[in-house]
């Protein structure tokens, strides 16, 4: 994924990604930055994975607004790997369980446990 024979700790690389992962807490932040940057379209909707797994069912109005922002973004950009209430699970387990992530894939995600 790095296009190199070897990488070392601390080295910065430009990795070829198989996908990205966001959840109901981090995706709204990414959406705001996406919009601030002036983007109209996502590069590859098939590589975007959004899982509502932290505050669903929603615990309060803020959580409901965050979920709504994710739903709107997924619908606007035809993101097929959007996992809403009733179709979601723990994001780190869900992607491998659904066959979206397989051995050797390189996925980045906006969550503290993404290394799983």
List each language-model region with its residue ranges.
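Fe-S-dependent hydro-lyases/dehydratases of central metabolism
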Residues: 1-116
